[in-house]
Every structure is written in structure tokens, then in C-alpha cells.
């Protein structure tokens, strides 16, 4: 459940641990982060599969609006160490060598920007960064990324595909 959430939102551990049931609006398809590093509430969209997963989880979990969304078996807030250990156990069972909650943020950012074609400014807002330079650190670009789907973004390829005539832009005089 938490793995899906991390891959949907790219949240940091402290933010995920602080989410209460009332912070999730499945009808609106968003989650409100009320406890962030910059102390500003963020509104983060949820994709359709995540909404379905959270609906099922809510039916199974129950709870009061002020209860933590992700909690221990006794209903208390997860500790950072408890969350880290749970993720490490899950990743080990799945054969994942590198395990860190923060790597989910990097994975989310890279997938959003490189693999899914999202834009850097929206990603910046989703991650809650005030500077685009901070977001840049989350998105390593490899040589293979430069050629992947390049025809979809090349002005020449787009013009040729649409049958448009290629004209030189006139200089302003």
C-alpha cells in the first residue's frame, strides 16, 4: 500500500507518516499534505489506480478522520525507522538491492519527467520544491533517454509527419 502511494506521489517519509485519513479526498482525487518541510499545505493529485487502492484500503482499514492513514498495528503513527524497515523488508523480498524511502522520490521524479513525459515545472510543484534547481537533482538523464521517443518531440519530425511545409521564420524588422 505505502509502496503504491510513494510511487504515485513521490513523498518524503515525514510527509507520508503525517497523513491523516481526513487528508485524503477520494472524490476529488487528491491528498492534502498538511505537514511539509516548508510548512505549506500541498494538494497532490491521485491517479485512478491509486484512488481504487485507497478505497479498498479504507474499507479494510476503517478508522476515524484524525487517525493516521498509514499506521502501526495498534493504530499509532509509524516511526521513521519502522517505515524504513518495512520498505527494506518489502524490497528485499522483491529482490531490490538498494532500498531507501528517498529513492522512491527519485524514482517518481524520473518516471514522471523522463518516462511519462511530464513537465519540470509541474514536477517541481508536486515535489514541493521552491527552486527548479532542487528538482533537477532528482532527475538523472542518461544517454538512452536522449534518443527515446525523440521523434515525438523533434520539430522536424512533427512537421514532416503532419505534412506541413517547412518555412524559415522571418526576422522582425
Model-derived features: where do they sit?
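Flexible coil/turn residues that form the inter-helical turn or adjacent wing/linker of helix-turn-helix
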Residues: 9, 76, 97, 116
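Conserved tyrosine-mediated DNA breakage-rejoining catalytic core shared by Y-recombinases
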Residues: 9-14, 18-53, 59
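A short linear hydrophobic-aromatic micro-motif
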Residues: 31-32, 97-100
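Catalytic-site neighborhood detector that most strongly recognizes the C-terminal catalytic loop/helix
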Residues: 35-38, 127, 131-152
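C-terminal secondary-structure termini that scaffold catalytic or DNA-interacting sites
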Residues: 153-173
Amino acid at each position: 500500500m505505502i509502496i503504491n502511494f510513494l510511487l504515485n506521489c513521490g513523498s518524503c517519509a515525514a510527509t507520508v507518516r503525517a497523513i491523516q485519513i481526513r487528508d485524503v479526498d477520494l472524490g476529488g482525487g487528491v491528498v492534502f499534505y498538511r505537514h511539509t518541510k516548508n510548512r505549506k499545505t500541498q494538494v497532490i493529485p491521485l491517479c485512478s489506480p491509486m484512488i481504487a487502492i485507497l478505497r479498498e484500503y479504507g474499507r479494510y482499514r476503517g478508522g476515524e478522520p484524525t487517525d493516521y492513514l498509514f499506521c502501526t498495528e495498534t493504530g499509532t503513527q509509524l516511526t521513521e525507522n519502522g517505515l524504513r524497515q518495512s520498505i527494506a523488508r518489502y524490497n528485499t523480498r522483491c529482490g531490490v538491492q538498494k532500498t531507501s524511502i528517498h529513492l522512491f522520490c527519485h524514482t517518481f521524479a524520473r518516471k514522471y519527467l523522463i518516462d511519462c513525459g511530464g513537465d519540470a515545472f509541474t514536477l517541481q510543484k508536486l515535489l514541493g520544491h521552491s527552486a527548479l534547481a532542487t528538482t533537477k537533482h532528482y532527475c538523472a538523464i542518461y544517454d538512452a533517454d536522449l534518443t527515446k521517443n525523440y521523434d515525438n518531440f523533434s520539430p522536424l519530425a512533427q512537421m514532416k509527419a503532419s505534412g506541413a511545409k517547412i518555412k524559415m521564420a522571418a526576422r522582425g524588422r
